[in-house]
Curated annotation (Swiss-Prot):
Biological process terms in GO annotation: L-tryptophan biosynthetic process
Pfam families (alphabetical): PRAI
Coiled coil: none
Source taxonomy: Bacteria, Pseudomonadati, Pseudomonadota, Alphaproteobacteria, Hyphomicrobiales
E.C. no: 5.3.1.24
Species this chain originates from: Rhizobium etli (strain ATCC 51251 / DSM 11541 / JCM 21823 / NBRC 15573 / CFN 42)
GO molecular function per UniProt: phosphoribosylanthranilate isomerase activity
InterPro entries named in the record: Aldolase_TIM, PRAI_dom, RibuloseP-bd_barrel, TrpF_fam
Protein name, entry field: N-(5'-phosphoribosyl)anthranilate isomerase
UniProt entry tagged with the keyword Cell inner membrane: no
NCBIfam families noted in UniProt: PRK01222.1-1 (NF002295)
Name of the gene this protein is made from: trpF
Length: 222
């Protein structure tokens, strides 16, 4: 069973085209203005059109207002909302009810205590994404090019569906898949020449590394 692969922080048609040709299952657009990967919703909507029906379109937001979500959902028409802020379980339920879209809830991880919060969202969020906690002083909640201790995920019940993120690149993604058996992986900075600038060559190298990985990806419910 191959893992889902999400290329996040996309901003150009060339990068999107290469991601789709290589088999990306998800493409992500970031609507957090402090990020170098930020994109205006109307431009994201235009860039996303070739992906419809080929990959899931993911809108990545950080503690958005209702007005911000209204604009993003109206223009982009995403398949999934990725919540990368401090959204409570109740807020996640409200967002799901308002927009009728599945939610992927992000948790920033440094220690085992960071994962204890997951339990309150089980049965509420449709999927989880585990990213490395941002270094002190960083304004970005993700996309910082750092990893966390993947062994912390070993306590998770096999029925918990998650994507692994945080510092993944061509050099470590195979090891990450073997050690975590994650059913999905998310990459952004690992396929960039500089923050916000995706490289089609690095996208190719990342997919090559995934394809050569001998990883027993965990099936749902196992």
């Amino acid at each position: 069973m191959k893992p889902d692969i999400k290329i996040c922080g996309l901003k150009t048609p060339e990068a999107i085209d290469r991601a789709l040709k290589r088999g990306a299952t998800h493409i992500g657009f970031i609507f957090f203005e402090k990020s170098p990967r930020y994109i205006e919703p109307d431009l994201a909507a235009k860039l996303a059109e070739p992906a419809r029906g080929k990959a899931k379109i993911v809108a990545v937001v950080v503690d958005p207002t209702n007005d911000e979500l209204d604009e993003i959902v109206s223009l982009l028409k995403p398949d999934i909302l990725q919540l990368h802020g401090n959204e409570s379980p109740e807020h996640v339920l409200t967002i799901k009810a308002l927009y009728g879209l599945p939610v992927m809830k992000v948790f920033s991880v440094r220690t085992a205590d960071d994962l204890k919060r997951v339990e309150a969202y089980i049965g509420i969020a449709d999927r989880f994404l585990f990213d490395a906690k941002a270094p002190k002083g960083s304004e970005l909640p993700g996309g910082n090019g750092i990893s966390f201790d993947w062994s912390l995920l070993s306590w998770l019940d096999g029925s918990i569906d998650y994507m692994l993120s945080g510092g993944l690149n061509k050099n470590n993604v195979a090891d990450a898949l073997v050690k975590t058996r994650a059913r999905g992986i998310d990459v952004s900075s690992g396929v960039e020449t500089e923050p916000g600038v995706k490289s089609v060559a690095m996208i190719d190298e990342f997919f090559d590394a995934v394809e050569t990985a001998d990883a027993p990806v965990m099936a749902p419910g196992s």
